[in-house]
């Protein structure tokens, strides 16, 4: 059997002319000079979805009354057990919360509390910048949650309205 030596000129040309290297370098140069798509974060902020789940808030009715009826559905549905509610009956027979605490160190921002609430009292608002220096600041009480609701009410109401067709 005679062995013939066939030279693959295409493979040899690729090897000696470094075509793969040149292709890779060209691709790198293409992306180097292309316009950048990053956001200069502290100075610019990207758009948020109406369904964005950020910092929690308790809402009030337009007349100032708290929406929460102390049904404790949010406490029951929370997989992280981050919500603690105590309630008392009022003189008119309805129930209202005396204590509404959320341990934000446990919260996984799943949104189940917001979905379970029959009166849209607990919502996850648009704020995602709530870093703290101590862990104690991440234990939200009823007053802090109501304050968040008052601060973000306009945007929360708009987001709930935009999300209404999908609920």
Swiss-Prot record:
Q: How is the cofactor bound?
A: Binds 2 [4Fe-4S] clusters per subunit.
Q: Say which enzyme class the record assigns.
A: translocase
State the SUPFAM superfamilies in the record.
Answer: 4Fe-4S ferredoxins
**What is the catalytic activity of this protein?**
a quinone + NADH + 5 H(+)(in) = a quinol + NAD(+) + 4 H(+)(out)
* Pfam families attached to this UniProt entry: Fer4_7
What is the annotated role of this protein in its UniProt record? NDH-1 shuttles electrons from NADH, via FMN and iron-sulfur (Fe-S) centers, to quinones in the respiratory chain. The immediate electron acceptor for the enzyme in this species is believed to be ubiquinone. Couples the redox reaction to proton translocation (for every two electrons transferred, four hydrogen ions are translocated across the cytoplasmic membrane), and thus conserves the redox energy in a proton gradient.
Entry's family note = Belongs to the complex I 23 kDa subunit family.
Protein name, as recorded: NADH-quinone oxidoreductase subunit I 1
Species assigned in the record = Cereibacter sphaeroides (strain ATCC 17023 / DSM 158 / JCM 6121 / CCUG 31486 / LMG 2827 / NBRC 12203 / NCIMB 8253 / ATH 2.4.1.) (Rhodobacter sphaeroides)
């Amino acid at each position: 059997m005679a062995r013939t030596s066939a030279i693959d000129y295409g493979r040899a040309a690729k090897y000696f002319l470094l075509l793969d290297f040149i292709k890779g370098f060209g691709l790198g140069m293409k992306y180097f000079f292309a316009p950048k798509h990053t956001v200069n974060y502290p100075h610019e902020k990207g758009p948020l979805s109406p369904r964005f789940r950020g910092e929690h808030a308790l809402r009030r009715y337009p007349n100032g009354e708290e929406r929460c009826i102390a049904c404790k559905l949010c406490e029951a549905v929370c997989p992280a057990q981050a919500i603690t509610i105590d309630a008392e009956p009022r003189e008119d027979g309805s129930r209202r919360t005396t204590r509404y605490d959320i341990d934000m160190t446990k919260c996984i921002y799943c949104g189940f509390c917001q979905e379970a609430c029959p009166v849209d009292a607990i919502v996850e608002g648009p704020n995602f910048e709530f870093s703290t220096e101590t862990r104690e600041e991440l234990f939200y009480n009823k007053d802090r949650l109501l304050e968040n609701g008052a601060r973000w009410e306009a945007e929360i109401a708009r987001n709930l309205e935009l999300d209404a067709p999908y609920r």
